[in-house]
Amino acid sequence: MSTEQVGAEITSIEELKSYIGKETSVGDWFLITQEMVNKFADATGDHQFIHVDPERAKQTFFGGTIAHGFFTLSATGMFSRDASGVRVRLAGSKMGVNYGLDRVRFISPVPVGKRVRVRRKLIGVEEAPDKRWVQMKNETTVEVEGNDRPAMIAETLTRAYF
C-alpha cells in the first residue's frame, strides 16, 4: 500500500471507483485466544474438539486447537477495526451494511495463540439504478502471522445506503 493511501478518506463514488484493483486497508495483528474460540463455540453450538479441547487437539495434525472457519469469517470486522488505509465515508450515506459473500475459502487453519490480520482490496463498485445504495466488493484476506498461505479469502459485499 502506498503511503499516500494511509489515512485517506473517500467521500465520493467517483473517487471510490478509482480504488478498484487497489489494496485499501491492512489491519493490525490480532491475537486469537482459546476464550474467544470457546465463546464462539458456545454461541453456535459447534463444540468440535479441534476447537475446544486443547489436549485432544494436540493429537491431531493441527497440533492444537484452531479457530472455527466461521469465527474467522465473522470476526473480519473485529480484526480490521484498527486498520490503516482508506476509509469510505460517502457523502449523504446514512448507513453501511454487510450485503453478502462470494467465493469464501478457508485455506489454512488459524491456530489458537497465533495472531491474524485482515487485508482488503477493492475489486468492484456497483451503484443502484435508483441511486439508493452503492455496493462495494472487496477481496478480504485473513493472514496468520508467520504463515505463507492465508487462512481465508472471501469476496465480501457491503452497501452504503442513502
Segments (PLM) and residue ranges:
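HotDog/MaoC-like acyl-thioester-processing domains
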Residues: 1-19, 108-162
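Hot-dog-fold acyl-thioester-processing enzymes
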Residues: 2-98
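Short alpha-helix capping/helix-loop boundary micro-motifs
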Residues: 101-106
